[in-house]
């Protein structure tokens, strides 16, 4: 049985949705940027790829992975689209790893892309409302009337606020975590830590100037506790509500992908192994407790990998809201210095379907800089889920 290993990892820089550098870049372009680049960096022949597995939450044009493969001249390579909301690209990597472990395929590319800027709106007709319809964002559809807690499915409630209430996290603590996130992300950018993992993407500005977009644009060096404290809460009608735009993740655009092969294939072809995929896991929780999905899945994935918290060198716990990593640190007694070492969702942003692969990519490059070790990427996922992946460099 082959061990799944990663032989290439790449991402685009993360753009701010709607008015950022990637606002007019189609989803397909994000995919056709990271796919050929990760194949090239891995030293693979495009025709050797057995399958492309991409996550994209709201792509309206069918199988994005296959479209990307064809557009990149890989017509003999099939593709499959997956969707596990925020954890989609973690699932893509896990599915590819499972195929390798089962000796079904030898070479795969897995990842995810997200362009919330260009996401198509969809029309929604409420039951028994007659012909009247309204436009809504497809990544946050209205709750099904039979879903428990349907009126409270807003992510700032189910991920941010309910987690903060359950664990007893104050707004001051969440704001402090968000500030830390921006500071760490800005420090990483200024130190050039992301240069190796980012593939520049040519974009055309509104004034016609073409530039290479290669620096994450969401982190803000001018973030302060005072500015965060001055932001209004998102639901003032809820007593004690403490979630703001500042201690939440951004709305963003990006793409990320990794190339996976079996360890035997890597040895035979002389490929450089960047990381081994040790384990992966997913959990379900009540939709009202979505934020706790990231907390619960950590215990499950560590058990599968046969590891203890102290065995992990670095953690990437997605900051969909600041309350999530804080809750995980409390639950497992983590060393916070090892958590979100270069920022996360509050600062870098959260390009939903790309975030998992982005986290894996950043983990790999940082662990390599530090001489290796075990890394864990974990995140909650919309609808009441959590996903996680364990790597060893």
Briefly describe each language-model feature range.
Residues 1-27, 165, 224-292, 296-299, ...:
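Condensing-enzyme catalytic core mediating Claisen C-C bond formation in acyl metabolism
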Residues 11-12, 24-28, 41, 173-268, ...:
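N-terminal extracellular/periplasmic Venus flytrap/periplasmic-binding protein-like
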Residues 22-107, 111-129, 198-213, 288, ...:
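Conserved beta-ketoacyl condensing-enzyme motif
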Residues 27-42, 64, 68, 92, ...:
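Short, well-ordered amphipathic alpha-helical segments that serve as non-catalytic structural scaffolds
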Residues 36-48, 163-168, 266-273, 299-314, ...:
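Phosphate/pyrophosphate-binding loops at sites that engage ATP/ADP/AMP, CoA/4′-phosphopantetheine
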Residues 55-107, 150-156, 222-250, 331-358, ...:
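Conserved catalytic cysteine-centered active-site region
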Residues 107-162:
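Flexible glycine-/small-residue-enriched beta->alpha junction loops
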Residues 159-161, 197, 205, 278-347:
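Active-site pocket-lining segment
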